[in-house]
Amino acid sequence: MRMDLDRAAEYDPREIPDEPYDAAVLIPVIERDGEHYLLFTKRADHLGEHPGQMSFPGGGREPEDASIRETALREANEEIALEADEAEVIGQLDDIRTITEYAVTPFVARVPDRSYVPDEREVAEIAVLSLSGILDPDNYEYERREHPHYGDVVIHYFRVDGYTVWGATGRIVVDLLELTTDWRAPERIDRDLA
């Protein structure tokens, strides 16, 4: 299966200007045998925030980052050894607000189909998951939860090849799929939280 990446290139993203912390992620899209794949990282178990969870390469904005896009590219280089000139940034998705007070800016990028090297300090492993696996209805579920500070929220789960993508990363995947494919989440609450 394939995404219509032109939709991401033409999209005018909504930005969240008022969060205390800025962060960015790179959504690496790989083309292999005519199908699209997404590259995820599994966070190292010793990390203080979100240990063992699946994520896209990314992190907090540093003072030396000239832009939030540069943050995404720097973090991808640090976490998976992707050189900035290897990434063809196609577009930007809506910012999402996390319960840890970050405004996360996702960037969609075509990247080469090659082996990537995880930074063992932050990344336990790299997983390249097929779009067809992500879109398989048997691999998706959601639940509504009551959050003590934010009220009713919907949590999206994508379970593919033994990996579970959920939380903020799950929200970003939902946004990407709804923009670039005909897939729609069965239920959604837009509270900008993940």
Short names for language-model regions:
Residues D119-D161:
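NUDIX/MutT-family hydrolases
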Residues M1-S55, G60-S115, V123, G151-A194:
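N-terminal leader/linker segments that precede catalytic domains of diphosphate-processing enzymes
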